């Protein structure tokens, strides 16, 4: 039987967004694959000195975890301050991380195909191909194309090499694919959309009422942001958007902010200065509670500076909420051109006005059938069949 290895390096301690996207890709592919699949997770571990300097929390070094009964080994790399300086300050190649990846190559000599996610795993897959002539594909999710390559000359060069060496590059949106072609040319590219878990669906009116009562928002409209409090998410605009909505809308409205990150304190301070504004900071929430949250809200807003294809907009639409956002990345591909706005001087007021329209009269905003894990798995499975059939090992 043919053997396929899947490599990814999303954070095991932050199981949302891209982590959940990869896990679902694996889960649905395993359900239909007629070939053997092994999955490997690469993780950074920051020693005490690195955590102190970077202000990051300690994480537990687990040996493995499970995806639907499939054991996934976790390979830990001890974060190096020297590597960080070389990569992000000097723009040159790492020493220890490069060695860590090179030492993994030999483990894959018996595989027929490598499916990698993002740059580091794509680099490892490229080295495996150079050593054993094993084909590989890379899936790109967002910041690995639109942000990270611009943070270091070496990362830019590495990303370009991986793009060109891959037998196929999958992008989660047409926008991300276009942005990748701005990095370089001469590589094979396809769009492979994220899907949505079956847990995200519209609840019955009675169940929605019960959940809203539990959350204390019965009889109110709810406008929500969900995501990381990072610069790329443009979260510092949220207080201004919320104030504008509150001034325009004549009924009761409350604002939810779900997530965490280094910009949270700044956003909290701005929200606290807004007299009369009703709001709630939820912090990070497990994925299991997000269907309840999205079934309790009326409108999700996402003012991002850039995106690949944000799962939260797909999930919110699947639960029956309306979504408004910036004209950034793959957001328009999901929510429609009439519900996105340029990040110009008029963005805050235009976004607030559209939110109020939706609060006053909910808009039909159906989720397109292409955002489906079954369809994604079918495309990926057919690719695996094609590439393993036409490729001959040396």
Question: Where are the regions a protein language model picked out?
Answer:
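Conserved donor-binding/catalytic core segment of Leloir-type glycosyltransferases
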Residues: 5, 217-233, 239-243, 256
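Short His-centered aromatic/hydrophobic patch
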Residues: 116-121
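Carbohydrate-associated surface elements
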Residues: 175, 195
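Nucleotide-activated donor-binding/catalytic signature segment of Leloir-type glycosyltransferases, i.e.
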Residues: 268-285
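Short alpha-helical donor nucleotide-sugar binding micro-motif in glycosyltransferases
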Residues: 284-285, 292-297
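Aromatic "clamp/platform" in nucleotide-sugar-dependent glycosyltransferases that forms part
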Residues: 305
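Short hydrophobic beta-strand element within catalytic cores of glycosyltransferases
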Residues: 313, 322-325
């Amino acid at each position: 039987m043919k053997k396929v290895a899947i490599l990814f390096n999303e954070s095991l301690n932050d199981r949302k967004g891209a982590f959940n996207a990869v896990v679902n890709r694996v889960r649905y592919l395993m359900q239909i694959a007629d070939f053997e699949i092994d999955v490997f997770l690469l993780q950074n571990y920051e020693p005490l000195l690195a955590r102190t300097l970077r202000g990051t929390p300690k994480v537990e070094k687990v040996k493995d975890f499970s995806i639907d009964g499939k054991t996934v080994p976790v390979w830990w790399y001890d974060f190096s301050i020297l590597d960080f300086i070389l990569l992000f300050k000097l723009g040159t190649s790492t020493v220890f991380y490069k060695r860590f990846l090179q030492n993994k190559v030999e483990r894959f000599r018996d595989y027929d195909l490598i499916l990698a996610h993002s740059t580091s795993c794509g680099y490892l897959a490229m080295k495996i191909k150079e050593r054993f002539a094993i084909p590989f594909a890379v899936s790109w999710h967002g910041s690995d194309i639109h942000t990270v390559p611009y943070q270091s000359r070496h990362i830019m060069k590495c990303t370009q090499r991986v793009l060109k060496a891959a037998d196929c590059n999958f992008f989660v949106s047409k926008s991300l694919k276009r942005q990748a072609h701005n990095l370089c040319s001469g590589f094979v590219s396809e769009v492979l959309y994220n899907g949505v878990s079956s847990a995200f669906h519209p609840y019955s009116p009675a169940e929605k009422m019960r959940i809203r009562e539990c959350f204390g928002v019965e009889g109110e409209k709810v406008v929500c942001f969900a995501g990381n409090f990072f610069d790329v998410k443009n979260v510092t605009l949220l207080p201004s958007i919320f104030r504008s909505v509150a001034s325009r809308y004549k009924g009761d409205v409350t604002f939810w902010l779900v997530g965490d990150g280094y910009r949270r304190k700044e956003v909290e301070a701005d929200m606290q200065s807004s007299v009369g504004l009703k709001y709630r900071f939820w912090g990070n929430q497990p994925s299991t509670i997000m269907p309840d949250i999205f079934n309790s809200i009326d409108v999700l807003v996402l003012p991002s500076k850039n995106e690949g294809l944000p799962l939260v907009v797909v999930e919110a639409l699947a639960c029956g909420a309306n979504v408004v956002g910036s004209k950034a990345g793959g957001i328009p591909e999901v929510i429609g051109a009439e519900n996105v706005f340029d990040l110009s001087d008029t963005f805050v007021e235009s976004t607030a006005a559209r939110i109020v329209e939706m609060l006053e009269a909910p808009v039909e905003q159906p989720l397109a059938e292409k955002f489906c894990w079954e369809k994604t798995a079918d495309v990926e499975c057919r690719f695996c069949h094609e590439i393993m059939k036409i490729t001959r090992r040396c």
